[in-house]
Amino acid sequence: MTQFLPPNLLALFAPRDPVPYLPPLDKLPHEKHHNQPYCGIAPYIREFEDPRDAPPPTRAETREERMERKRREKIERRQQDVENELKIWDPHNDQNAQGDAFKTLFVARVNYDTTESKLRREFEVYGPIKRIHMVYNKRSGKPRGYAFIEYEHERDMHSAYKHADGKKIDGRRVLVDVERGRTVKGWRPRRLGGGLGGTRRGGADVNIRHSGRDDTSRYDERDRDRERERDRRERSRERDKERERRRSRSRERRRRSRSREKEERKRSRERSRDKDKDKDKDKDKEKDKDKDRDRKRRSRSRERKRERDRDREKKEDRVEGEVPESVDVPQDDAQTGDLGIDGIELKQEPEEKNRDRDRERDREKDRDKDRDRDRDRRRSHRDRERDKDRERDRDRRRDRDRDRDRDRDHKRERDRGDRGEKREERVPDNGMVMEQAEETSQDMYLDQESMQSGDGYLSTENGYMMEPPME
């Protein structure tokens, strides 16, 4: 194609000059020759260190040992810090500790959102307050969760000490105690290894048992409340377990009934399928019998037809073989009747007739066979189509029955579930009514016990029976 281009375009397709060959600057790896062959290390063995002069191996510290060492060092460091702080700690010369120590009340476990005005409102009910000192973190300025309240009278401090312990302020129950740093000899705060822990009573067993409360009657009431709450929880737990057992039993019964119904449906379907199969077999047998009967009938008709044909042939042969004696046949006519043209005998005509008759009979037999074969083919095709239609109808009926059974099962399960839920809703309602009645009776009993008597009064702050304040 390019040969027909003009010369100016052919010049564009001309090949370039070949790249000039330049010898490589470096030799290939297999062409390089090493000046010195490889040598052994025998001359350098004397430079090695003698194994006998090597230092003994050092034992490294394991992870567990390192953690234990760090924990021990931390404890020792903390003990050293406590000892150093104990040397310089003097509560009597503390600049932040002001006022009379015997009129000062210590309040702990205070909510971080509680303000000084809220504390003043809560503790002014016991007496006039002189000063409130809330402790804050020196670095971040956030509250530490405790405060010191100084009353104007010592009896007001004692009243607050007795009645305000366990009082709920801003969602938290506070712990109330006297100031022990300047009133108890040898007292040390908890950060220096002292303190009362989480309570103001003393021993570990008492602290854990009473959780920082001082009044024995209040402990007893609180224990009774705990026991009552525990019993209520146990009863509710037992009711839940019984309800769950009833539900499980009902579910098991429903499951068993569903399984039985499924088995019954399966057996009924199998029985109906067997009946259909038996009916099909009976129909097939009847059909085979009809076919055999038709075949036998056709064979008998063919036999009768053959017999009639034979009888007819015999009669014709008998009629042709008889010649009347009264008729005189001339000799010339007899000779001409016996001999045909060119001397052929005329007695061969019955043989040809017999041969034609046999040929015609064979043709009729073949026609009958073809007709019977076509009839059987049409009948078998019709039977196959009928069987297919019957099988299709049977599958359609089976699918319809299966869908109907499934819908019935879903409806029955839904009805049972609704009845079970209604029954369970009725049962807990009665149980809750009884439980509420029991709680109401218990609360009335407690209210009767906590009524004001001649020796004490009912505190509106925490609801405990207290002794009247000392004059």
UniProtKB/Swiss-Prot annotation:
Residues 192-201 have a biased composition (Gly residues). GO terms for biological process: mRNA splicing, via spliceosome; regulation of RNA splicing. Transmembrane segments: none annotated. Residues 60-78, 207-245, 260-293, 304-321, 344-428 have a biased composition (Basic and acidic residues). GO terms for molecular function: RNA binding; U1 snRNA binding. Residues 48-78, 187-471 are annotated as: Disordered. InterPro entries: Nucleotide-bd_a/b_plait_sf (IPR012677), RBD_domain_sf (IPR035979), RRM_dom (IPR000504), snRNP70_RRM (IPR034143), U1_U11-U12_snRNP_70-35kDa (IPR051183), U1snRNP70_N (IPR022023). Gene3D superfamilies: 3.30.70.330. Residues 246-259, 294-303 have a biased composition (Basic residues). It is found in: Nucleus speckle; Nucleus, Nucleoplasm. Residues 92-202 are annotated as: Required for interaction with U1 RNA. It comes from the Eukaryota. Residues 103-184 form the RRM domain. Keywords: mRNA processing, Nucleus, Ribonucleoprotein, RNA-binding. GO terms for cellular component: nuclear speck; nucleus; spliceosomal complex; U1 snRNP. Component of the spliceosomal U1 snRNP, which is essential for recognition of the pre-mRNA 5' splice-site and the subsequent assembly of the spliceosome. snrnp70 binds to the loop I region of U1-snRNA. The RRM domain mediates interaction with U1 RNA. Component of the U1 snRNP. The U1 snRNP is composed of the U1 snRNA and the 7 core Sm proteins snrpb, snrpd1, snrpd2, snrpd3, snrpe, snrpf and snrpg that assemble in a heptameric protein ring on the Sm site of the small nuclear RNA to form the core snRNP, and at least three U1 snRNP-specific proteins snrnp70/U1-70K, snrpa/U1-A and snrpc/U1-C. This is U1 small nuclear ribonucleoprotein 70 kDa.
